[in-house]
Amino acid sequence: MLVAVVLPTYNESENIARLLTQLRNVLPDARLFVVDDNSPDGTGDIAERCAREMGGIEVLHRPGKQGLGSAYRQGFAHVISQGVDVVVSMDVDFSHDPLVIPAMLAAIEAGSDAVIGSRYVNGGGTKNWPIHRRLLSRWGNLYTASVLGVKVRDCTSGFRAYRATALASIAPETTKAEGYAFLSELVVRLSRRGLKISEVPILFVDRENGTSKMSGRIIAESMLLVTRWGVAHRWNQAKSFVQVKTRERKS
């Protein structure tokens, strides 16, 4: 099974070399693809050095900060074009433990089309989070799942493994969201297509080095888009119901 790991980066100079080393130890044959948004702290240069030293690493240098969704769209398209079997996405700041990846790959081999590293299934959780952040994240995920009608407990986790054919089938290159709303948009598409989504427990550890990319603007954007998608979904359901009843009355 050929695995590719897509790693969006922006100012992760304190983390990138150590993460690439750990990934190479956990997944000796995987292809590692770094998508760097012209990090001022030299993240891209460090990734290039690792590529020369370790092999099996590609680095895409983008001209500026273009967002998480954009980075994943470009990264997914690149690795899918290489004919890989599984695509893994994850954060670079060690919030996501590379040692969990084998369990995610095992779930893919067992028949899942997508596997989410989940904070909100039995055995999962968070570490070093203040209470307000835990409550906000939990509420946000409950709201997202309820509004969008998806049976996923952690819609916003970026730690995932996708069967490459399943990922390609939902056309991620046509998604519109940026920021963390992009992750929810993928969950919606997977669910609407009837693909099998499973969740494995993870302990999400707050970053020790670097600066978080999360902001109030990103959270607001995510909630607004989720609400918009939910309204559109309910409207389409209502229209379908009316159309069915109309046909029944005519028959």
Task: Indicate residue ranges for each PLM-predicted region.
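Short, acidic, metal-binding catalytic loop of nucleotide-sugar glycosyltransferases
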Residues: 21-30
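A conserved acidic beta->alpha catalytic loop
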Residues: 36-45, 94
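N-proximal low-complexity "stem/linker" segments adjacent to membrane-targeting elements
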Residues: 1-22
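Short beta-strand/loop segment that forms part of the nucleotide-sugar
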Residues: 29-39, 60-61
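Hydrophobic helical membrane-anchoring modules
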Residues: 1, 149, 172-251
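Acidic helix N-cap motif at the loop->helix transition within catalytic regions
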Residues: 14-18, 41-50
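Short beta-strand-to-loop acidic/aromatic patch adjacent to the donor-nucleotide binding site
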Residues: 84-93
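Acceptor/aglycone-binding surface of glycosyltransferases and processive sugar-polymer synthases
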Residues: 58, 62-81, 98-180, 207-222
